[in-house]
């Protein structure tokens, strides 16, 4: 199986936000008519682990990351504990509400099996 290095957002969508000092990140494969949707969902569910998230988003390294599989929705929910410090009012981050975290994750390059890209 050959892999190609592509942005995660090639076929993965995202939404993100804050809950106190934690960041919440939803990643899913849309129903776009692709014959590869089921295989893409399977790849996403098996690929997105706490370690994967810490590599994908270096600012999450050293933090507690939880990943919840949502197979019926074709995605995962990721909680990054403590990413926002004491919360939006006290955060010094450029994106204190983690609203841009989803697009940042989608822009990051990952190894994707070639057969999922056609």
Go through each PLM region and give its residues.
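Long, contiguous binding/interaction regions
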Residues: 1-118
